[in-house]
Amino acid sequence: MATIKEIADLAGVSRGTVDRVLNKRGSVNPQTAQKIMEIVHALDYKPNRAGLVLAAQKKNLRLGVILFGEGNPFFDEVTDGIRQKEEDLACYNCTVQIKRVNVDTLEQLQAIDEFVKEGINGIAISPTNDPRLARRIDELFEQGIPVVALNTDIKNCKRIAFVGSNYYQSGATAAGLMRLMAKNESTKIGIVTGSEEILCHTERIAGFTNAIQSYPNIDIVATITNDDDDFVSYDQTTQLLKEHPELSLIHISEPTRLR
């Protein structure tokens, strides 16, 4: 079985350079990186998983996850997935802590502070799109604590990755389905959305409304925001229907509220 040392010797570089290329971290000359990868493929190099486990076990990694509140069916399933993966990570001496908070920037900042005090090594968060949170994520990056945005993104910060959907496109797709249901007839629609603080909600609405504008027979007569609250959503939607009996269709941009 080929080793990193053998690859380094054949490429005429250090083992550290090979490690950076294999793990895609740090800056390596593109020609050198290509040469290393050609050697890797030629030798059919496979990482020593036993060695990785032993190395990881010395680190005692702690990961933190911040999700939106209890009782949200979508995030209940996300939590189940995290717990399932946590079992796989146990052999790497990695533990995962989950905090559930409301759609509130201050609560998210408090959860981050608690994680930092507990010595967390990395954080995944479903963030509000708030400059205060963006600045805190930048601070974490400078401290060597990487942050991944989960399900909804945040603008203008140093989060290292976003795991989620193209919400603008999903909104546009919903508009296309509305057009099919309207059957080219004059149609009045209402919009129910969650929170203006959550980027995936605002992106869905932007994609939806921009696409609807190209369908001249469809008019948006009202948009309501339920602050991600079931009871508020019920009351406001009921009021919407009373005030606008001409509505034919309602677009609910946050389907987790339907239970």
Task: Map each language-model feature to its residues.
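Single conserved hydrophobic/aromatic residue that forms the stacking wall/gate
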Residues: 251-259
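Short, solvent-exposed amphipathic alpha-helices that sit
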Residues: 74-89, 170-174, 199-217, 232, ...
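Amphipathic helical "hinge" segments at domain boundaries
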Residues: 48-106, 110
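Short beta-strand elements in bilobed, periplasmic/extracellular small-molecule ligand-binding domains
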Residues: 87-105, 191, 212-231
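N-terminal helix-turn-helix DNA-binding module of bacterial transcription factors
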Residues: 1-53
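Hydrophobic alpha-helical segments within soluble ligand-binding/sensing domains
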Residues: 163-187, 233-234
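Short, well-structured alpha-helical segments in soluble
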Residues: 105-120, 232-246
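Flexible loop/hinge segments that line or gate small-molecule binding clefts
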Residues: 130-169
